[in-house]
Amino acid sequence: YQQLMRERSNKVKNHIAANHSEKVKHIISMVPDGGNYKDLPEEYKDSRNFHVAWTRFASDKPAPTIDTGHRHHFHYKYNRVPTVRECARLQSFPDDFIFLGNKTQQFRQVGNAVPPIMAECIAKQLKKYLGEN
């Protein structure tokens, strides 16, 4: 999969990590692999209005749905939210696809998109079906 995503690219774009404060990084560090805000000690649960959407990706399971928000999930390994490129990779965008606009707009483009590999599979099935009729 990684080789396929990197096939036509010699540089990774849209891969700038968020610059979280030390306090936020500390709070994120307390969320276990696959966990969410409910795993935080009580004194931290209201410190940044964490809610159920704040989850850490599980390192050994498929990622949850990527949506238009860019602060709903934490990276499975690093104490930060994923980059636009990491979300795009999960959505099957090849690394040579460049998202334009500010970071919020880029995350919105990724979250609103139909994953390219899924779109290709649907198109192949439609072509097959329409070719038969």
Question: Where do the PLM segments sit?
Answer:
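C-terminal target-recognition/interaction regions appended to catalytic cores
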Residues: 1-133
